[in-house]
Amino acid sequence: PVLTMKYFISQFMADIYLLKEAAVSNDRKNLSKLKKKAHQSGKRALNNSKKVALNCVKTLRLMGEYYWLIGKQKKALNWWDKSIKTGEAMGARPDLSRTYFEVGKHLLAPGSKYKDLNGITAEEYLDKAKTMFIEMDLQWDLDELDKLMAGR
């Protein structure tokens, strides 16, 4: 299960990337097919994460990213809420901090219908992420956060 977990997570991440690229380039021809493929790989990763808790928080975060990408923001927030609660319960700090970052980033996005999740604003999630990135010396993540803030 551990080796298949890495494969399923990688496949899901690749499918999300391709879906993002198709959405950005307005590739309507492939969008439907890529949505379906990402959904299937997400379900496989999610089912596998139930057997191997190692990447559970990451998988839940990616499910949120998938649903946000396809325009289902409320579902995305529900997945991110699950990711946060699971990350807090498991003490999975790196993935929890990355979930905070994703939530903050998406709540700040121009097309966001929501301004908070569980009463916590985008800025507060980004502050939480930054604090954790610094504590864990996650320089790449900190650089990504800095890029986001510079672009605001």
Map each language-model feature to its residues.
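Helix-coil-helix junctions within alpha-helical repeat/solenoid scaffolds
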Residues: 1-152
